[in-house]
Swiss-Prot record:
It is found in: Cell membrane. Residues 5-97, 120-219, 228-324 form the Ig-like domain. GO terms for cellular component: immunoglobulin complex, circulating; multivesicular body; plasma membrane. InterPro entries: Ig-like_dom, Ig-like_dom_sf, Ig-like_fold, Ig/MHC_CS, Ig_C1-set, Immune_Resp_Modulators. The chain crosses the membrane at residues 345-362. SMART domains: IGc1 (SM00407). The keyword Nucleotidyltransferase does not apply. Pfam families: C1-set. This is Immunoglobulin heavy constant gamma 2A. Keywords: Cell membrane, Disulfide bond, Glycoprotein, Immunoglobulin domain, Membrane, Repeat, Transmembrane, Transmembrane helix. Residues 363-398 are cytoplasmic.
Length: 398
């Protein structure tokens, strides 16, 4: 149900301030749904502004913002909190007025910052997909509490698995230098099968600055499972003139989108690779690319590179595609081999032609010689046959 917000200006309680700066606040309470926009002086005042994340309580949101200005700026100049809630078409402008008469305060009086509702914010993060799907690794669910005041650093964090409290989490506190607040990180080791079976993990946080404990829950999303198709692609020929070349791993047709891709070189993990985020395809599945930059000489020397993919749809949740430079891919070598082959074929053709030519010449000469000899023999015989016998003719005449 749409509910318009109530807006409350927050001012220091001591009248005039003795310090060089003063912090003012604006509380936006009891609205639904999100979002609201909050600006100071219609956006012209942006320096020193800190807007806290919205907090959901009893199905209504509460948001607060503070702005720090110099004592000479306020209250001598007007400062207004501008709130807009599009869902309810609400716009509210609240001018920050001094509380009480502006009298000279007692010397010990020091104005505290307004007690803004919001305080710490809580976030929960799932385990890394590789840690969940590889039995040799340990998955961890993480709860992070930010913007914890140094004045109230005590944060109580409780963990529940399917609403059963567990006590195996490890919690550490870190100081944030950029805004002088504390960050509390609680890590809960979990069982692989608990996450894969869809159990619910809940982080419950309490602190003095919180009006009520904040709970955050997380579990494995439900949905269809489809194993990815993995393809590895060598560098394009146009890139072989450069010092570095690109190897590509294309992963397609997988569901859900949680996936882990890495590269190895002869069994050693490579670091110089980049993965795209999974992209939703038209059929509801996902695809992604991973590229690895390597030195060309390493590729030319035929080092073996592998693209490893971890996904719940795969057999044993893991597959690896390996490849290296294939012999004979060098264009110069291919051309040289082709040229040598063409020359060999040409010499063979020439040799056969010459042999056949010489054989033909020899055959023609032999046939011609035989014919000449036969004709000559025939002429001689014929001449002997028809020659007159002069001796008989002389004898008859006598």
């Amino acid at each position: 149900k749409t509910t318009a917000p109530s807006v409350y200006p927050l001012a220091p309680v001591c009248g005039d301030t003795t310090g060089s700066s003063v912090t003012l606040g604006c509380l936006v309470k009891g609205y639904f749904p999100e979002p609201v926009t909050l600006t100071w002086n219609s956006g012209s005042l942006s320096s020193g502004v800190h807007t806290f994340p919205a907090v959901l309580q009893s199905d209504l949101y509460t948001l607060s913002s503070s702005v720090t200005v110099t004592s000479s700026t306020w209250p001598s100049q007007s400062i207004t909190c501008n709130v807009a809630h599009p869902a309810s078409s609400t716009k509210v402008d609240k001018k920050i007025e001094p509380r009480g008469p502006t009298i000279k305060p007692c010397p010990p009086c020091k104005c505290p910052a307004p007690n803004l509702l919001g305080g710490p914010s809580v976030f929960i993060f799932p385990p890394k997909i590789k840690d969940v799907l590889m039995i040799s690794l340990s998955p961890i669910v993480t709860c992070v509490v930010v913007d914890v005041s140094e004045d109230d650093p005590d944060v109580q964090i409780s963990w529940f698995v399917n609403n059963v409290e567990v006590h195996t989490a490890q919690t550490q506190t870190h100081r944030e230098d950029y805004n002088s607040t504390l960050r509390v990180v609680s890590a809960l080791p979990i069982q692989h099968q608990d996450w894969m079976s869809g159990k619910e993990f809940k982080c419950k946080v309490n602190n003095k600055d919180l009006p009520a404990p904040i709970e955050r829950t997380i579990s494995k999303p439900k949905g269809s499972v489809r194993a990815p198709q993995v393809y590895v692609l060598p560098p394009p020929e146009e890139e072989m003139t450069k010092k570095q070349v690109t190897l590509t791993c294309m992963v397609t047709d997988f569901m859900p989108e949680d996936i882990y891709v890495e590269w190895t070189n002869n069994g050693k993990t490579e670091l110089n690779y980049k993965n795209t985020e999974p992209v939703l395809d038209s059929d509801g599945s996902y695809f992604m690319y991973s590229k690895l930059r390597v030195e060309k000489k390493n590729w030319v020397e035929r080092n073996s590179y592998s693209c490893s993919v971890v996904h719940e749809g795969l057999h044993n949740h893991h597959t690896t595609k390996s490849f290296s430079r294939t012999p004979g891919l060098d264009l110069d070598d291919v051309c040289a081999e082709a040229q040598d082959g063409e020359l060999d074929g040409l010499w063979t053709t020439i040799t056969i032609f010459i042999s056949l030519f010489l054989l033909s010449v020899c055959y023609s000469a032999s046939v011609t010689l035989f014919k000449v000899k036969w004709i000559f023999s025939s002429v001689v015989e014929l001449k002997q046959t028809i020659s007159p016998d002069y001796r008989n003719m002389i004898g008859q005449g006598a």
